Amino acid sequence: MNETTRQLIVHKVKHNTKRLITSIKWVIFSIVVGIVAGSCGTAFYFALSVVTDFRMKYPWLIYFLPIGGLTIVGLYHLCKDDNDTGTNLVISAIHSGDKVPFIMAPLIFVSTLITHLFGGSAGREGAALQMGGSIGSSIGRVFRFDEKDKHVMIMCGMSAAFSALFGTPMAAAIFSMEMISVGVMYYIALVPCVISSLIAHGIASYFNVTNEFFAIENIPDFTILNSVKISALAILCALVSILFCVALHSSEALYKKYLPNKYTRVFIGGCFVIIATMLVGNQTYNGTGMSVIQSSIDGSVRPEAFLLKIIFTALTLGAGFKGGEIVPSFFIGATFGCLFGNLTGFEPSLCTAVGMISLFCGVTNCPITSLLISFELFGYDGMPYFLLAIPFSYMLSGYFGLYRSQKIVYSKYKTSYINKSTH
């Protein structure tokens, strides 16, 4: 063996050994993150179920929502987290290396429970992303990972918590990689995110966390006429997704402009939600509203339901209450889809499912995740309809999004690099 051949073999052995060690490292740490974040996500699921059932049993708790808001603001001030950037901080940490403090996890855990206990209109997946991102980042700091590896740990944590809480491991694994920079997928995190997501889902399943699944009763044949109807629904959902994003961001801006004091803002915001609840006459639009999604599948919701949920959620989150925006987007999409189906005479349960997924895609700018979550929530039988609707919603929702720190790296309309933040 000559010297050149020997050096080549040594180089390849060293190179492949380094790859093997790196792979083993990520398998080990993704399991750790999956266990920790999955356990926290599972605990959060049960805690949220308890407070939701308690509120449904005692509906008068809604009148204490302003006090709950003051408690949330006080907790964040006590923990010296006055900037309160939430999910946006987790996303920007992957872009810029900002620190995600560990205190974010218990803060969002407790604050979201307070919001739901007293009837704020919010979701839960946003809380899961913050909890998971905080846990992943903290584990990375403990083991002295460099900045790039910490970014992967944050994505692992986000995937794990989302998977445990919502029971969609496929979508959860991809979501954290896709949502950060629209047009660029962080494939470096693929193996860690998949493992973390599956581990977390396994933990949740062990403790009998119920996976969300909605059965579509009747799926019509995929004809040209039906494809036109679904395309029209997707286009309308893109417009509704813009309306939802604008409502959320505008309400926050208006609250801050006219009520600059955080305590006053959250107290008045809580009063607004109480007044809105009294005007409606029920608490259909408080909390997550997951039961309304099932009613939409059955074809029985009020036509104004999607607009009222937008208003309730904007009043709640804009004032400073905590939770997520994703489940409200499911609610809005489902009720709007049901309305479309009832008005056009097209299968309401299918329109509900397509509306739900299309609106999710429009507000998150994540078409691959949207397709995967459609399979996990509704099965594969409606695949052609989801496959057609999602691209329309993605393209026509423009550069709007739930999270201002989300980057649109490549244009939706040209093969050009734009690297701009969402509206």
What are these regions (language model features)?
Residues 1-423:
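Alpha-helical transmembrane segments and immediately membrane-proximal extracytoplasmic
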